[in-house]
Amino acid sequence: MIRKANELKKSLEPELKGGIGTVRLTHFIDEHEAYGVGRLFGVSTIPPGGSIGYHTHKDDFEIYYIMKGIAKVVDNDKEDILHPGDSMICFEGESHSIENIGDCDLEYIAIILYTEKRRG
């Protein structure tokens, strides 16, 4: 199956997880097409000064791959800076947040996969 850019589902998430601003999501596939392995497969875009608030993953885990911009992340209370080409994994039971500290949009691939507990 081929999907052109204009066919991909897009959504807006204001103040995601208590963050600042509105995150734009472009979904590669829908959760229902993922055969029960996960719930997010796409590109997240955070405007300058925006963020996704600190939160904990339960029965799933998340992977980030930075494509554009500069991100300040908190990974289990440890702060770091990510640049294009960097990645981060927040495993089940762990916590994280991400903030755009650059002057252009922060774009990154975001994938949330279920753990065995969730897939049952």
Q: Whereabouts are the PLM-identified features?
A:
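A short, N-terminal "cap"/entry segment at the start of jelly-roll beta-barrel domains
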Residues: 1-38, 119-120
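Short acidic-glycine-tyrosine-enriched beta hairpin
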Residues: 77-92
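Ligand-binding loop in jelly-roll beta-barrel domains
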Residues: 92-118
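Short, conserved beta-strand element in jelly-roll/cupin
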Residues: 45-47, 56-73
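A generic "binding-loop/recognition-motif" signal
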Residues: 48-50, 59-60, 78, 94-95, ...
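Conserved short histidine dyad/triad with adjacent acidic residue
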Residues: 27-31, 42-57
